[in-house]
């Protein structure tokens, strides 16, 4: 018997009146989290914030509930890491950065990353570890479209190192401290306004910071002060971050994020997907 309101629009007083006509019901209310007026209205009308809902289009919705029943309604506890969007969790030695960056010029051409959010083909990558032995295969099969999966149904996909990985023993040594490592890639963003548009990686059901999930880690190898990451938290609040060379960052790619390189140099990050366990998990919850 619950009533669900999926969107608010119109004059605030009109909205209040319409909701008052349904005062005998239990309510679920969804509002755009970045619309502070509607969030404030929900609280004014006695709704309790339950949590966020994030869409594949990068929208953050706030879910509210109001009970008109004598029976209390409970909701499951959400782990703290689910509310984490981005966090600096460590630093990498300058020797590591210098060793890796010196080899980047010897690498083959980076592969354009097929994505609706990479319309200008500014974002590209190379694989050190992925689902095929070829370094130019940079995708995760489970993220791809049904048409792609049908066309590639006879191809065997399994996690494996590519030949490029042998060029970077320092990367292998660094990642040996993690209990389980999935994809390892160099990701490049072109200068002069190269942009990865606001989006979420909701299609990857394995990702996140919770224990047992795939945590996305970024280590900037080459960057510049005009390279800015913007992330949106679960309340829809934006945060602009510059990841400096040698920083180690966690990024929850299920949350909206955007990258723009307004500098004059390519940005290259070492990007790792590792299972959130042990010290890695502790660094996220501490």
Language model features with spans:
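Non-heme Fe(II)/2-oxoglutarate
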Residues: 72-178
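Conserved catalytic-core motifs of GNAT/GCN5-like acyltransferases
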Residues: 30, 48-62
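A short hydrophobic beta-strand segment most commonly corresponding to one strand
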Residues: 215-220, 248-250, 264-281
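Conserved metal-binding segment of the jelly-roll/cupin
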Residues: 241-256
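Conserved active-site alpha-helix within GNAT-family acetyltransferase domains
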Residues: 33-51
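Conserved acetyl-CoA-binding loop-helix of GNAT-fold acetyltransferases
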Residues: 7-21
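Conserved GNAT acetyl-CoA-binding A-motif
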Residues: 22-32
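A short beta-strand-loop-beta hairpin characteristic of the jelly-roll/cupin
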Residues: 220-244
